[in-house]
Amino acid sequence: MTAIDFHKLAKIELHCHLDGSLSLSTIRHLAELAQIDLPEDDEELKQHVTAPVTCESLLEYLESFDYIRPLLQTNEALTIAAYDVAKQAALENVIYIEVRFAPELSMDKGLTVTETIDAVCQGLRQAQEEFGIIAKALVCGMRQSDQSLTARILDEANQVRDSDFVGFDFAGDELNYGPAAIKPLIEQVKSYNRPMTFHAGECGCPAFLAESIAMGIKRNGHATILAQEPELLDEFVKNGVTGELCLTSNLQTKAAVTVNDFPYLKMKAAGANITINTDNRTVSDTNLTKEYELYHKYFDSTVQDFYAHNKTAIEASFASDEEKEELLARLAKAYS
């Protein structure tokens, strides 16, 4: 297959972080609005906002986000950013995307939780109207933050009723803040009866993924540890959990030291629910087209595999039932 074939394939993305996926041109635009100086050379700028090909750890990978935080402190900036990420996705034939972000990281200059969600949803709607993509927002609680602050943020977010804000996630430092450490926050979100996904299995800790499965969470970000844990993989499959796999990101952070440590083939053989994602388009210097190329290169994934994974993604998405029906029909037509 050639690159153009991968580009043309209709795609679904469930795991994409807003602040890790801004295009360089949008980063420059936002810096201008915030009156923040940036390196004039794109290659130099890229070094600040793209993580090394191999990082020492997940925490080193997360350092790239510090550069973006000051740029996302106004309604206008968040709207521009959300539009940019959804546009990037649409231009590579992504027909549905969930973009996740942490309101806390955009509240340094006085924005409220509600204002951040409204601004992101506005940007996503602009992209939907312009490009025909369906784009939704997820709100992340930061697991390493003060829990009383996170609890307030989650409660305020839950008051927002916007059809483009569809669920919750917990992101950040998994290693030091596993599910048990933030269990009250997880239970708080579960009490809302709104969809939730959860980062687990990215830092080499099988217990964290096991805990998230035991808590009844049906979508999991990364699940990388499954490559080494056959019994946990059985539980993952038995409980119908869907994995949001992020190959390039996992290789960067050493969640998977080599391609052989990535769980895709074992998950596929076990009949697990698999989706393919970028995680962070800019921080990982990737997009879904590149990810599909890598799956084909390393795992011999076929067009039929991509069709199956995209169907899984639609079924596991937080879209409405009507939107899922529409997306499944669009996907079937695109792959026929």
From Swiss-Prot:
<dbReference type="GO" id="GO:0005829">
    <property type="term" value="C:cytosol"/>
</dbReference>
<feature type="binding site">
    <location>
        <position position="17"/>
    </location>
    <ligand>
        <name>substrate</name>
    </ligand>
</feature>
<dbReference type="InterPro" id="IPR006330">
    <property type="entry name" value="Ado/ade_deaminase"/>
</dbReference>
<dbReference type="Pfam" id="PF00962">
    <property type="entry name" value="A_deaminase"/>
</dbReference>
<feature type="binding site">
    <location>
        <position position="279"/>
    </location>
    <ligand>
        <name>Zn(2+)</name>
    </ligand>
</feature>
<protein>
    <recommendedName>
        <fullName>Adenosine deaminase</fullName>
        <ecNumber>3.5.4.4</ecNumber>
    </recommendedName>
</protein>
<feature type="binding site">
    <location>
        <position position="19"/>
    </location>
    <ligand>
        <name>substrate</name>
    </ligand>
</feature>
<comment type="similarity">
    <text>Belongs to the metallo-dependent hydrolases superfamily. Adenosine and AMP deaminases family. Adenosine deaminase subfamily.</text>
</comment>
<dbReference type="GO" id="GO:0008270">
    <property type="term" value="F:zinc ion binding"/>
</dbReference>
<feature type="active site" description="Proton donor">
    <location>
        <position position="202"/>
    </location>
</feature>
<keyword id="KW-0378">Hydrolase</keyword>
<feature type="binding site">
    <location>
        <position position="172"/>
    </location>
    <ligand>
        <name>substrate</name>
    </ligand>
</feature>
<dbReference type="GO" id="GO:0043103">
    <property type="term" value="P:hypoxanthine salvage"/>
</dbReference>
<dbReference type="InterPro" id="IPR028893">
    <property type="entry name" value="A_deaminase"/>
</dbReference>
<feature type="site" description="Important for catalytic activity">
    <location>
        <position position="222"/>
    </location>
</feature>
<dbReference type="GO" id="GO:0006154">
    <property type="term" value="P:adenosine catabolic process"/>
</dbReference>
<feature type="binding site">
    <location>
        <position position="17"/>
    </location>
    <ligand>
        <name>Zn(2+)</name>
    </ligand>
</feature>
<comment type="function">
    <text>Catalyzes the hydrolytic deamination of adenosine and 2-deoxyadenosine.</text>
</comment>
<dbReference type="GO" id="GO:0009168">
    <property type="term" value="P:purine ribonucleoside monophosphate biosynthetic process"/>
</dbReference>
<dbReference type="InterPro" id="IPR001365">
    <property type="entry name" value="A_deaminase_dom"/>
</dbReference>
<feature type="binding site">
    <location>
        <position position="199"/>
    </location>
    <ligand>
        <name>Zn(2+)</name>
    </ligand>
</feature>
<feature type="binding site">
    <location>
        <position position="15"/>
    </location>
    <ligand>
        <name>Zn(2+)</name>
    </ligand>
</feature>
<dbReference type="GO" id="GO:0009117">
    <property type="term" value="P:nucleotide metabolic process"/>
</dbReference>
<dbReference type="GO" id="GO:0004000">
    <property type="term" value="F:adenosine deaminase activity"/>
</dbReference>
<dbReference type="InterPro" id="IPR032466">
    <property type="entry name" value="Metal_Hydrolase"/>
</dbReference>
<dbReference type="GO" id="GO:0046936">
    <property type="term" value="F:2'-deoxyadenosine deaminase activity"/>
</dbReference>
<dbReference type="GO" id="GO:0046103">
    <property type="term" value="P:inosine biosynthetic process"/>
</dbReference>
<keyword id="KW-0479">Metal-binding</keyword>
<keyword id="KW-0546">Nucleotide metabolism</keyword>
<keyword id="KW-0862">Zinc</keyword>
